[in-house]
Amino acid sequence: MIRNVIFDVGGVLLRLRYRPFIEYLAAAGVDMSDLPAWLTRVGLAAHERGEITGEELLERVAAMARTPLDRSELQARWLDMFDRAHEMFELASGLMADYRVYLLSNIGDMHWRHLDAQYGLDDLVHGTLASFRVGAIKPTAAIYREAERRFELEPAATV
């Protein structure tokens, strides 16, 4: 019997629109032709594991630009890539009475602070697990084991 429901944040509770950010960087001369390679070079996975801060990540991004980037604008554009998926917030809220509901997300510190302030993520559900806080990202087993431990989950009763 299912007793626990886990939602992701980006792409589930919040629609991810990163295209404007990529276009902004490309216009500043950052080579965005191979997005997966760029994400590796900039260290996104390390950022989402909490090994580098959002400020450090944006410094790396700015250093890749051929033309100087205004740090405030860069940060604003970095933070402005999510839109609330109202139907998913309603679903998560609606399940709270009958299930234990959690959030599990690959996310860095800066995005988490911004999204929590904007949408109340930490108070929305029974518990949250942000990758930067535990030093592990999906799909590694470590983050799922931490969710099991922290939320006292039984995998067979969790979706």
What are these regions (language model features)?
Residues 2-90, 97, 108-112:
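N-terminal helical cap/lid subdomain that shapes the substrate entry/recognition surface
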Residues 4, 102, 159:
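Hydrophobic "anchor" residues on beta-strands that sit immediately upstream
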Residues 33-34, 123-127, 155-158:
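Short acidic capping loops at alpha-helix termini that bridge into adjacent secondary structure
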Residues 37-41, 106, 123-134:
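A short, structured active-site edge motif that brings together acidic residues
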Residues 93-96, 120-124, 153-154:
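Short, conserved loop/helix-junction motifs that constitute active-site signature segments
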Residues 112-119:
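Distinct, well-ordered alpha-helical segments
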Residues 137-159:
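Conserved Lys-Pro-Asp/Glu-containing loop-to-beta segment of HAD-superfamily phosphomonoesterases
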